[in-house]
Amino acid sequence: MVIRFWSARTTQVRFPEYLRHFNANVLPSLRAVDGFLEARILTQSDTVVVKFIVETLWSSMEAIDRFAGPDREEAVIAEEALHLLTSYDRRVRHYEVELCEKTRPTTTSA
């Protein structure tokens, strides 16, 4: 498995619109790619700025190539999303997953 990281910044005002764009446009296009496994958006914010990382998990680098095209490290950013961002990485980072531990939620009885 491979994790693809991309980061950007926006404003508190524009971030909800970016999330709507991500849900309506990005997620459907990711789901259509064989080998896409999951996506997360991580945030760090203050009263004005939202810094965020988009983390996508893929079955292989070949799956990422199907999504990203010939330059897998070039960020894939829809034209309609650009006006929502104050800054963004033009390149992405990929990391091979060497260890993954998931905990199962425990059920508590009241």
Predicted regions mapped to residue ranges:
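Glycine-rich beta-strand-turn "strand-cap" elements at beta-sheet edges
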Residues: 40-50, 76-110
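Short, well-ordered beta-strand segments in beta-rich or mixed alpha/beta enzyme
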Residues: 3-9, 40-70
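Short, flexible segments with low predicted structural confidence
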Residues: 1-3, 18, 35-39
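Residue-level signal for secondary-structure boundary sites
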Residues: 14-16, 62-64, 100
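An amphipathic, aromatic/His-enriched active-site/gating alpha helix that lines ligand/cofactor pockets
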Residues: 24-36, 57-94
